[in-house]
Amino acid sequence: MVKAVAVLSSSEGVSGTIFFSQEAEGAPTTVTGDLSGLKPGPHGFHVHALGDTTNGCMSTGPHYNPHGKDHGAPDDEHRHAGDLGNVTVGEDGTAKFTIVDKQIPLIGAQSIIGRAVVVHADPDDLGKGGHELSKTTGNAGGRVACGIIGLQG
């Protein structure tokens, strides 16, 4: 069992903690999270390529995409590995969620440890919105909070 954690923060008052666990190599990764300080509704949620927050969330690079695919929904065959869809925020500005995904391993050459997780301002259109950004970012808007995924003991 490998575990990881990302503590999210932002200059806009958004905060949260995201936990990751993977039982064994080849097994899916379970992601559980708690977020607060967001506007109600769906928000794009992605693993980005870089664990660099020297310029806030802007320096985390593009969505993690080791196979060079177009942006898509979490259940699409062709998608960025880091495309985790949306998290839904309640009227109180908080979200609690669990995601199980096979494309974001903690073990092996394509591990997401050391990369960043990012919450976006707007809903992810899952690559199906017809906007010029749909196939690259899901047209999910600005980056409102992020954290580096680190190994947990």
Curated annotation (Swiss-Prot):
Its EC number is 1.15.1.1. It is an enzyme of class 1 (oxidoreductase). Its cofactor is Cu cation; Zn(2+). Zn(2+) binds at residues 63, 71, 80, 83. Transmembrane segments: none annotated. Disulfide bonds join 57-146. Destroys radicals which are normally produced within the cells and which are toxic to biological systems. PANTHER family: SUPEROXIDE DISMUTASE CU-ZN -RELATED (PTHR10003). This is Superoxide dismutase [Cu-Zn].
